[in-house]
Every structure is written in C-alpha cells, then in structure tokens.
C-alpha cells in the first residue's frame, strides 16, 4: 500500500516520486543518467541504479518498466535495479529538439502496376505527359518562327551565361503551346458528319479530345468534355501512413508466476505484444527459465490517406459547345458569348443549350465513364488522388479504420507500423516506422492519377451523347454574297487534323454578307474538299473572320470572293488519300465500338433501319468518299446496282455474299451521302 513508503525527500533526489499499484514509481529526467537514485522507505533507504542508454528528455514518448530487487547478484540483461525494494521507473526518450525515435524503413507494399485498370489517361510517374508537351513545343516552334526568334532574343538578352540563356529559351517555348484555341489546338480531334436528312447524330466525348459535328444546313459545332467531377464520394477505408508511439509500458513475471498483464491491453488505442524472455538470479527471479513479458504503447496516427467509393449517380459532366461562327477567338473560349457550358448528370441526362443566333441543340447523354466502379477505389493522399484496384487497396498492409468510424483512434492492424524489438528481462523497446508516404508514391507507379478541384475529384472516361439538331439553323442563310474585296489577315495555317485555317478581312460594302469560298483543282474545273466552318459570314466591315476548311491531298486553289479582286491562294496538302481513308475508317469503327448498344434504336422498325444506316455511314463513309470522289451520285447508284447484280449471279457462295453486301452498302451510301461532299 501507499502507506508502506515513507516519501521523505533525500538530499540527492532530483526526480519525481509517486506510486503505481501500491509500489514506488520514479519519474526520471535526463540529468539523472548514470547517477544513484535514492529515496527512503519503511525498510530504509532504497538505492536504484539506472543505466538506460535511451534516457532522454521528458516528453509524451515515455518508457515505463519495473527495476527488480538485487542485493547480492550481478545484474544480467537489465539496465535498472534497486537494493531494497523493486521500483517502477518512467523516463522520456525525446531528443533536446523534441524529436521522437522512429524506425527508418518502409512497409513492403505491393506495386499497383499490372493490376488491370486500363484507362486512357496518363499514369502516375509515367513520362507520357512530358513527352506530349515536348511534341507540342516542337510543333509550336515550327509554326511560329517569329515568336521563336523573339523568345531567343529575350533569352539572349536576359541570360548572362549560355546555360541561363538555354534555360530561359526552353521555359519561354514550354509556356507558349498552352495558349491555343479549342478544337484546332487539340491533337485528338474527331469529325462526325451527319447523314443527309437526319435529325440526330451520335458522338463520343472523352477527355483530351474534341469532336466537330457537321450536317447539311446546320452549323458546325465543336464539343469538348472539359470536366467530370465526382461529388461527395463515400469513404470506404482510411489508412494510417505516419504514426507516433507514446506511453510505452512493460510488465514481466518470473518463471511459474503466470502471464503478466497491463490495464492498457483493454484500451483499443494501445498496441501490445506478449513474449517470453530468459529470467534468473541476475534480474530478480529465484528460478532460472522463461518468464512472460508484455509491452504496450499508445498508437496515435499523425497522417492518413482515404479510399473513396464513387457511385455513377454522383458524377457530373461539363461539356463546352462552341459554334464555328468565324468570329475572331470564337473557337476555344470556354465561357462568354461564344461557348456554351452544359452540365450533364444521371438525374438530368437530357439538356438543351441555347446558342445565340444558331438556335437550340439538344443533347441526350448516357453518363458512362467506361469504368467499373465496383472494381475501383479512389485513393486520396493529401492533395493527390489515384484510381486503384479495389482488392489491391483492401490488401494494403497498413493500420486502417472503417470509413464510418468518426473517432479516429481505434486503428485496426496497428502492428504493421510498429516494431517490437527483442525483449530484455524487464524492458522491451518499441519503435514506430517512419512516414510511408514515399513508399506509397513508389507503390502507386502505374496507377491512374486523378486531378482534384475544390475538393471534388476530376475523372476520366467518355460520354456517349445523341445530338438532336432539328432546332438548329444556320446563321446568315438569307444574306447575299459579298461582292467586295477580301484581304488576308493571317496566312493559311495547317492544323494537325489535315484542315487549314485562314483569317480574312472584308474591305467592301454590303455587310452582313456570305463569304464566297471554294477549293478547286489546278484546272479550276472541279470543286473539291469541304468547308468545316459552314456558311462563313461577315457581320461587319473590317472585322477579321476565321475560316476552317479541309482541302484535298495534293495541289489545289483556295478561292475567296468574286471577280474582280478575287483571292486565289495555292495550297499543297501532304499525305495519302488511301492512308487517310483507312485512318478515318478505324476512327469510325472505334466510335461504333464505344457507342455499343446505345447506337441502335430498337423502338421501331424504322428506328432499326435508321440505326443500321448511320452505322454504315460512320464506319464506311470515309472509304466510300475516297473511292468515289468526283463521281456523280447517279453513277454511284449504278455502280452499286451492278455490284449487287454480279453478286447475285455468282456461283461462289462466299463471293456472292461479299459482293451483295458491298453492293448494298454502296447503294445506301450513294443514296444517302450525295449531299455531304463538296463545299
């Protein structure tokens, strides 16, 4: 009992003396290292010797254990003993700067690479993003020699050494490619052409790409999916990646005295371990043998990461629709008077966008990311997030809490971040591993990184949309043709999509008016190519207008205006018609594969046939256009009839079926696509 101890302050005592379970308990400071600790009891003066090597400053990181009674025997495997009565001792292990001890190693985390999550975005720690930007820099330098020379002059003037000049020049050119327009500046661009007479068209939108739609007597529209946000995802599990240990306590028993126990074992905040250790005369036991020992330490998490589950109904898609008006800077503005921002959610999948001067476009979207959220978890660590495999996440060997836990202290699997050292007779060292943030970054190699904005997670994936264009109309169809002169403000520039962009300015009278624009062969007999900016118009005199068009491969003339004063610009387009044909066909087939069952209308017999027709147009339209360019539509129909007739009369079954199919496709495309070619 407490009355057994006469706590008279001795002359040399600079430590604090209290009791623990009725036994004396010393709380020792760093200054007592190597000194004899004296205090009086009923049995006389008790002298304790403390030789602990880890004795440091008093802090919350403490060690508590019992110094055994030794009168005549030599101490063995102990660093504290007393000569009158066994005594508890507590001391801190912090350094003078207050730092805690920790184990400088990481948990063996399985790398995420190869876990089977295939997405089209760049993966964590891949060089793809840097390589893409290097390509953009190269293209920008080649297309903007004037700016490049200016950047070189600035770098030469500002820098004092060759290294500084080179670095400044690289930085200036690296910033420049980010200042581009919307669809023209995006390398992954898809052109979707509507079937003549159709009121709707299917498109596939994905991040990092742009879709340009064209249809007869309808404005050309640019669509870009700029953002997919996951709103308020639910937390599945929290993992601790950095922890600290405090209040370490050890209790031990001599052989045959049973298992030791501590009150801390009942507290879920503590991590504990039972072991066996050699005991004998040298450490306070009358018998030699194995004695039990238990050590507990309070586990506190300093930094954690969370795994969140995203439900498809929590996704919100943001699309920007921009009509090709020809106005300066019209293409590429997210907001303002040119572009219209549309929000799509599973709850409101049908939305309308009012395009000033062009009517209304209705979008019926199927919000699908193309990702199976049952197999995925969003791993969020500070300001970064990754898309990881669910099973990989659940198997991480780290302390964790259920997502519903609000207390944040009852961590499960705490021992994964704790190392119990080999036990001594009366004491056992426990250390916590260092921060696992770096190990997690390494293990996440190959996982898809997810961007964050205002606490919401930005996703990847694609969006399938059906555009209804029956309420759209072309602006300026009733205008007369411009009869005055045009001036080239900016020379013809080739885009990375095989199209050209030219900026012209009208100097004549009679605006607003329609701009006469044609692309012709060298003999000026046939109209070739197609206009991407449908029905370009001048709204006011001396106002620059951007026109985008797709010239044919090889030499051609671009003719703007009427005689006299007609602009005639020669243009040569590099490349192969056959190569372009196959590339476009592959794009169409890929688009149909992504659309899947949403491309088909099984609501009516007419809907089925319309869907089949649109599928044929999307996949085979490019081959057909390349094979029969310049051929009249009546001749195309005749060729289709002849191929079908030959197939029906062929004796070979496989050849007959093949020719009949080719003939039917040719007939259909000949009837339906006659209004899509030319300008």
Swiss-Prot record:
- Protein's UniProt keywords contain Disulfide bond: yes
Report the protein name in the record.
Genome polyprotein
A GO BP entry: clathrin-dependent endocytosis of virus by host cell
Keywords in alphabetical order: Clathrin-mediated endocytosis of virus by host, Cleavage on pair of basic residues, Disulfide bond, Fusion of virus membrane with host endosomal membrane, Fusion of virus membrane with host membrane, Glycoprotein, Host endoplasmic reticulum, Host membrane, Host-virus interaction, Inhibition of host innate immune response by virus, Membrane, Secreted, Suppressor of RNA silencing, Transmembrane, Transmembrane helix, Viral attachment to host cell, Viral envelope protein, Viral immunoevasion, Viral nucleoprotein, Viral penetration into host cytoplasm, Virion, Virus endocytosis by host, Virus entry into host cell, Zinc
Provide Extracellular-side residue ranges: 23-138, 181-625, 674-679
- Species of origin: Dengue virus type 2 (strain Thailand/PUO-218/1980) (DENV-2)
Q: Which residues form the propeptide?
A: 1-14
Q: Where is this region: Fusion peptide?
A: 278-291
A GO term, aspect molecular function:
protein dimerization activity
What positions does the record give for glycosylation? 83, 247, 333
Q: Report the transmembrane regions from the record.
A: 2-22, 139-159, 166-180, 626-646, 653-673
Q: Which Pfam families match?
A: Flavi_E_stem, Flavi_glycop_C, Flavi_glycoprot, Flavi_M, Flavi_propep
Cytoplasmic side residue ranges read: 160-165, 647-652
Q: Show the disulfide pairing.
A: 183-210, 240-301, 254-285, 272-296, 365-465, 482-513
Q: Where is this site: Cleavage?
A: 14-15, 105-106, 180-181, 675-676
Q: Which InterPro entries match?
A: Env_glycoprot_M_flavivir, Env_glycoprot_M_sf_flavivir, Flav_gly_cen_dom_subdom1, Flavi_E_Ig-like, Flavi_E_Stem/Anchor_dom, Flavi_E_Stem/Anchor_dom_sf, Flavi_Glycoprot_E_cen/dimer, Flavi_propep
A cellular-component GO term for this protein: extracellular region
Domain characteristics, as noted in the entry? The transmembrane domains of the small envelope protein M and envelope protein E contain an endoplasmic reticulum retention signal.
């Amino acid at each position: 009992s407490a009355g057994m101890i006469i706590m008279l302050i001795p002359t040399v005592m600079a430590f604090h003396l209290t009791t623990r379970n009725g036994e004396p308990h010393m709380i020792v400071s760093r200054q007592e290292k190597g000194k004899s600790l004296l205090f009086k009891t009923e049995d006389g003066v008790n002298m304790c010797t403390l030789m602990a090597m880890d004795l440091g400053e008093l802090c919350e990181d403490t060690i508590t254990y019992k110094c055994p009674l030794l009168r005549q025997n030599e101490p063995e495997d102990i660093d504290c003993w007393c000569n009158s009565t066994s005594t508890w001792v507590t001391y801190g292990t912090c350094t003078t700067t207050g730092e805690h001890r920790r184990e400088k190693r990481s948990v063996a985390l399985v790398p995420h690479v190869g876990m089977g999550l295939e997405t089209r975005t760049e993966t964590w720690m891949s060089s793809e993003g840097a390589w893409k930007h290097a390509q953009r820099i190269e293209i920008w330098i080649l297309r903007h020699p004037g700016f490049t020379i200016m950047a070189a002059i600035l770098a030469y003037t500002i820098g004092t050494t060759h290294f500084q000049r080179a670095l400044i020049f690289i930085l200036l050119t690296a910033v420049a490619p980010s200042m581009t327009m919307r669809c023209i500046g995006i390398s992954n661009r898809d052109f979707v052409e509507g079937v003549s007479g159709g009121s709707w068209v299917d498109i596939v939108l994905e991040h990092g790409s742009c879709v340009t739609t064209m249809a007869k007597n309808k404005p050309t529209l640019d669509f870009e999916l700029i953002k997919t946000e996951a709103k308020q995802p639910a937390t599945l599990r929290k993992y601790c990646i950095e922890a600290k240990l405090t209040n370490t306590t050890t209790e031990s028993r001599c052989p045959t005295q049973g298992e030791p126990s501590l009150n801390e074992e009942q507290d879920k905040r503590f991590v504990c371990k039972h072991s066996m250790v050699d005991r004998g005369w040298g450490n306070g036991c009358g018998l030699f043998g194995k004695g039990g020992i238990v050590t507990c330490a309070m586990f506190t998490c300093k930094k954690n990461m969370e795994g969140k589950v995203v439900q498809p109904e929590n996704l919100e898609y943001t699309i920007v629709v921009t009509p090709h008006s020809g106005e300066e800077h019209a293409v590429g503005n997210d907001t303002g008077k040119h572009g219209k921002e549309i929000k799509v959610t599973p709850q409101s999948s049908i939305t309308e966008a009012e395009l000033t001067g062009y009517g209304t476009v209705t979008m019926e979207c199927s919000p699908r990311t193309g990702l199976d959220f049952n197999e995925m978890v969003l791993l969020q660590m500070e300001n970064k997030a990754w898309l990881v495999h669910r099973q990989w996440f659940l198997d991480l060997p780290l302390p964790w809490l259920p997502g519903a836990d609000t207390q944040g202290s009852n961590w499960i699997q705490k021992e994964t971040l704790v190392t119990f050292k080999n036990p001594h007779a009366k004491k056992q060292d426990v250390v916590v591993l260092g921060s696992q943030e770096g190990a997690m970054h390494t293990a996440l190699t190959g996982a898809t990184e997810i961007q964050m904005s205002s606490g919401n997670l930005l996703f990847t994936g694609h969006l399938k949309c059906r555009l209804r264009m029956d309420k759209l109309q072309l602006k300026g169809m009733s205008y007369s043709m411009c009869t005055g002169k045009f001036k080239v403000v900016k020379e013809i520039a080739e885009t990375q999509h095989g199209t050209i962009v030219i900026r012209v300015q009208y100097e004549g009278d009679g605006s607003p008016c329609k701009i006469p624009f044609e692309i012709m062969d060298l003999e000026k007999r046939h109209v070739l190519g197609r206009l991407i900016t449908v029905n370009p118009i001048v709204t006011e005199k001396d106002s620059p207008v951007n026109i985008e068009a797709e010239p044919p491969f090889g030499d051609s003339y671009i003719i703007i205006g009427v005689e006299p004063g007609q602009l005639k610009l020669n243009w040569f387009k590099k490349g192969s018609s056959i190569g372009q044909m196959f590339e476009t066909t592959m794009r169409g087939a890929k688009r149909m594969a992504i659309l899947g069952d949403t491309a088909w209308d099984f609501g009516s017999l007419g809907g089925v046939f319309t869907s089949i027709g649109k599928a044929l147009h999307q996949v085979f339209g490019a081959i057909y256009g390349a094979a029969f360019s310049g051929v009249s539509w009546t001749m195309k129909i005749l060729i289709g009839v002849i191929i079908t007739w030959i197939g029906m009369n062929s004796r070979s079954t496989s050849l007959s079926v093949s020719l009949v199919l080719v003939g039917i496709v040719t007939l259909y495309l000949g009837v339906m696509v006659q209004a899509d070619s030319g300008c």
